[in-house]
Amino acid sequence: MTEPGKVPDKATGLTRIMRAFGYTFDGLKATFKSEAAFRQELLACVILAPVALYYGPGGIAKAVMIGSLMLVLVVEIINSAIESVVNRHGTEWNIHAKLAKDAGSAAVFIACCNVGIVWLLCLFF
């Protein structure tokens, strides 16, 4: 949407909203193209969302089950953003870069554990 290296002019109203949507889709496209984990998690969501709709015991349970899947995607996008910024800063090893990347990875892991817990509770208890 924006040329690399060029800062877009400030926008207001509908123009700002349309640009925001463009940036959103740019981010989704970039994450999909560059992150295998995001593609795998998206595939899992595409497969599991209909399972939640079919087997979920009620509307709230279905919403929570699908919401837990979407949370994994959100956290993966944030993790990818962290990794991208850390990688841009430099290629040499740095303890702070390691901590940032490890924390992002841990956040994705916790979101995945959340899916398991939510689904077990919704389907079996």
For each feature predicted by the language model, list its residue ranges:
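Short basic (Lys/Arg) and small-residue
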Residues: A100
